[in-house]
Amino acid sequence: MTQPTVVAVVDIGSNSIKALVAERGGPGGIAPLLNEAVDSRISAGIGGTPPRLTEDGMECGAAAIRKLLDAIAPFAPEKTALVATSAVRDAANGTEFARRIQAVTGHELRILSGGEEANLIGRGLTSDPRLADLQSFYVFDLGGGSLECLAFRSRRIEQAISLPLGCVRLTERCVPDPAAPFTDRSRADVYACCRAAFGSSGFRFSLPAGSGAVFTGGTVTTVRQIVAERSGVSLPETSPVISVARLRALLDEIAVLPLPSRRQIAGLPAARADVLPAALTTALAVAEAGAFSSFRHSLHNLRFGVAAELLEV
């Protein structure tokens, strides 16, 4: 069978839905042709018992998927994959959403297990030429529903787990009023959730001393965009290394602000302003758990891993 040369991926995350069209080639084996995202929080309600996708969330998600498929169409990909992560995986009505998406798009929606998600994120990371110098390192991918944690030794995955520490999930669980300033109590509750999850997960920080940590997902992308706006440069011109001190300073800055004021911060998407405090707190809890002073940021995560799978690279 002839290997495909152009593929497309729609990554249905908890806080946004992203599309990637890619072809074989480039330094990491994958050359992106289109990279587009739509803020569409399908995960509202996943903090409930049991977690459920709301009707509004499913409708908004379906509209975003149709919009991205329209953007993909001119590239005529030979294979197109739709994948869903924590919000759909954990929702009691996740399979109903998958059936709805297949009915309106004609594409089957693949609901990834936590292990599949973590491993595909790892596969995507290794396609990033900017990380080619890393041999043994950790990867943390924070979404709206979950936190994927990986450890690479000699560029091979040694550990991969999924923890229920997504920023939408923790905001619903730990922040009584997301429109109000982020209180010390909420910060402590998010930290406690993270410590408990790491403590019971069996994830080991056992790589050689000095092994780096990569952070992916919208949280650090947002931090870099805020830095870019304040520096008068584009996001790619900012450093991909984000210090823990910078994360802590940004959290201290936004924690005292009510939601309307947070939404005025240049570079901070309005749709993420309510969950960013919990997201930054989670990143700081990861740094504490692993004794990291900084993270390297990469945009090559899940959708790049799925593209690598489709392209067979």
Regions found by a protein language model. Name each.
Residues N15, E78, S293:
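Short acidic/polar active-site loop segments enriched in Thr and Asp
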